[in-house]
Amino acid sequence: MLIKILGSAAGGGFPQWNCNCENCLGLKQGTIQAKARTQSSIAISDNGKDWILCNASPDIAQQIAHNPELQAPSSIRRGTSIGSIILTDSQIDHTTGLLNLREGCPHQVWATPEVHEDLSTGFPIFNMLKHWNGGLVHHPIDIQTSFQVAVCEAIRFTPVPILSNAPPYSPYRHRPLPGHNIALWIEDTRTGHSLFYAPGLGQMDDSILSYMQRADCLLVDGTLWKDQELALLGVGKNTGQDMGHLALQEERGLIHLLSQFPKQRKVLIHINNTNPILNEDSVERATLKQLEIEVSYDGMLIEV
């Protein structure tokens, strides 16, 4: 099973267009060692030819341009190697890219009923794209049931409800239902190898820990180093908890959590532009390296 990191940053990308925090300014001026990153999205394949897109970031057109395996085969005039799309939530940063994919409609989109409701009301992408050659075809995800997608039939997806938050535009903000945010336990049925994918983790519970324990690779939320990082840097008021993200450094943060999984490969994704781990020469980055926690980057290929 192949996992291609299309975008490794959180909302806004890195550098963020309107930000002069130490990281963003340092990257723009060339004073820090860091890689530019687009917004969070991955693609999964069981054969290297057909792909399932997990979340459609606002940067999806750029991501497809930089990853030829997702482009139309040269034998056809128009098309794509993306056969289906799975959404883990209804956040703007994970769904706006659907608008950029409208020329390729109809698209088969797997999402929970809660996500579909948000994307039919508060941010009505499903309605907006109806007139584009059939638009988005919704395949409901039942959070109690594993599912497979025909385009990569060897891969089985198990939705794992996670404690995070609904988007700011949603009427369920600060009171999300179980289907508003899911992680995915992704298994190659041919080999039994598996990936736990959770770009947004707000809190932990026994179910999440159980799936993480069973996985060979953990591709998880690396949004913030400190819970109050935005306020400390003077770029915002929201904490990690406000946004549904468990910070890395906190006493019961993600680093502490990942220490419980010595056998698994551990990779961070959805990294905010303020996070010091983006600076490859930082103390924080060195800490992760010592703990054998990787920082994903755009174009990274993971084989499980």
Curated annotation (Swiss-Prot):
Transmembrane segments: none annotated. The keyword Transport applies. It comes from the Bacteria. Signal peptide: none annotated. Disulfide bonds: none annotated. The gene is pqqB. Keywords: PQQ biosynthesis, Transport. This is Coenzyme PQQ synthesis protein B. GO terms for biological process: pyrroloquinoline quinone biosynthetic process. InterPro entries: Metallo-B-lactamas, PQQ_synth_PqqB, RibonucZ/Hydroxyglut_hydro. May be involved in the transport of PQQ or its precursor to the periplasm, in association with PQQ biosynthesis, but is not absolutely required for this synthesis. Pathway: Cofactor biosynthesis; pyrroloquinoline quinone biosynthesis. It comes from Acinetobacter baylyi (strain ATCC 33305 / BD413 / ADP1). HAMAP family: PQQ_syn_PqqB. Belongs to the PqqB family.
